């Protein structure tokens, strides 16, 4: 069995309602995959297929509705659903996800 090849990986809090679900975020040629830590209340893994991604942008994280650090990765799907992750180096994540979506379109994966 071959190990998956990740374009990027790092610690991330996925924003689910009022909870920031801590874990790791992985980007490969097909999807963004969030794997929560075992200590979270919400432990369900979440995968976003790159073919579902309409746009990716860097946005400000909010605390009690107040914009704070510009360290949030917002992924908008073609369905209109928005998924947000608090990450380190959000700008680099945006570039890598955009590049992976473009590469997937070129190769016919998307």
Which residues does each predicted region cover?
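Hydrophobic alpha-helical segments, principally membrane-spanning helices and signal/leader peptides
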Residues: 13-14, 34-36
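Anionic N-terminal interaction surfaces
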Residues: 1-29, 46-47, 67-70, 77-81, ...
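Short, hydrophobic/aromatic-rich beta-strand segments within well-structured domains
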Residues: 33, 73-74
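Phosphoinositide-dependent membrane-docking surfaces
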Residues: 32, 47-62
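Short aromatic-glycine motifs in intrinsically disordered, low-complexity regions
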Residues: 35-47
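Short acidic, Gly/Pro-enriched loop/turn segments at secondary-structure junctions
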Residues: 39-42, 57-71
């Amino acid at each position: 069995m071959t190990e998956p090849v990740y374009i990027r990986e790092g610690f991330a809090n996925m924003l689910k309602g009022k909870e920031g679900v801590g874990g790791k975020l992985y980007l490969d040629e097909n999807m963004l995959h969030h794997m929560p830590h075992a200590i979270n209340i919400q432990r369900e893994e979440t995968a976003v297929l790159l073919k579902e991604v309409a746009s990716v942008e860097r946005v400000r994280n909010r605390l009690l509705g107040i914009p704070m650090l510009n360290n949030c990765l917002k992924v908008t799907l073609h369905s209109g659903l928005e998924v947000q992750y608090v990450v380190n180096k959000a700008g680099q994540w945006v570039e890598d996800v955009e590049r992976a979506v473009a590469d997937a379109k070129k190769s016919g994966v998307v």
